[in-house]
Amino acid sequence: MTRMDAKTPVSTTLGVDRRCFLGMSASAVGVACLPGGYPARSRLLQPWAPLFEISLAEWSLHRALRNKELDHLDFPEKARSFGIAAVEYVNSFWKDKARDAKYVAELKKRCEGEGTKSLLIMCDGEGALGDPDEQKRKTAIENHHKWVEAAAGLGCHSIRVNAQSSGSYEEQQKLAADGLHRLCEYGDKHAINVIVENHGGLSSNGKWLSETLALAKHPRCGSLPDFGNFRVSDKEEYDRYLGIDQLMPFARGVSAKSHDFDEQGNEIHTDYARMLEIVVGKHAWRGHIGIEYEGSKVSEDDGIRATRKLLERVRDAMQAKLDERAKAAGKDGK
């Protein structure tokens, strides 16, 4: 594995003062901090800061991890080898280690050594938070407690969960909202947010999920909008651009799903320029956007690099437009 030292440049783009972005987005919102101080989106942006930072979701390397070509503890170093200094974990790659204090401490030490920030843990296989059976729902909530604790130990801001349930549209909303609210109450004890990804079933319906998050009525309950997970069923595909737009008001993170690329380096299933205009332009997102490569036509490493390059290219184009407008505004003001 090629190791990049602390001086290795990470993904950033320089440009004019981002404060000028305020007047260029009709829907720009004010400074908003989540519990624990994590910024959801900022109105007053720091000079020379990139429009958004890039993180790496561990799922991008799921084949290497499953084939024992990469150890979970080496993920921070692997991310740094791509010039990425923020990571998003997947619980299935360290399923029995959540309450292993030494293991969590070692992982945190590895991150600190690489200059890598832990953002969140994606949690699967712990039961349905919206299970119609009260006892099963309670068990699912409690099963997630250990990941809340692990996230706190690593310095994450959130755990990502699923809003699985069964029943009618409204019944599933009520059940999932109940489970989410109760888990968020535990998150309060550790300053950890509980965020839901559009991840199959009704959760891939942006309207249903946004309504469910509102119904949960807890400030720690948010979303992790994923560019590609909008298949509600084998017969129903939800509009991904509409879905992202509906989920962004609740966003605590953003997942840039990628599969395949054309000769120009564009993702062929998602128009990244259009998507980032929604995320960054309309909703003024200023947090990390996480690479989640899931394709198979190129290697995982190459897929990660291609996704990063695409994100940077679109980000640079957006920044160039802002710079031009800022210069024009400056001339008009003279």
Regions found by a protein language model. Name each.
Residues 5-153, 171-174, 181, 188, ...:
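N-terminal pre-domain/capping segments
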Residues 60-62, 91-93, 124-127, 160-167, ...:
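Active-site-proximal loop/turn and secondary-structure-junction residues that shape catalytic pockets
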Residues 86-87, 177-278:
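Acidic/histidine-rich catalytic cores of soluble enzymes
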Residues 116, 192, 283-287:
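A short helix->loop->beta-strand "cap" motif at the edges of active sites that frequently abuts
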Residues 151-169, 190, 195-199, 290:
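Active-site groove signature of glycoside hydrolases
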Residues 256-263, 286-300:
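Active-site clefts of carbohydrate-active enzymes
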Residues 274-284, 295, 313:
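Short basic/hydrophobic patches in alpha-helices and adjacent helix-turn junctions
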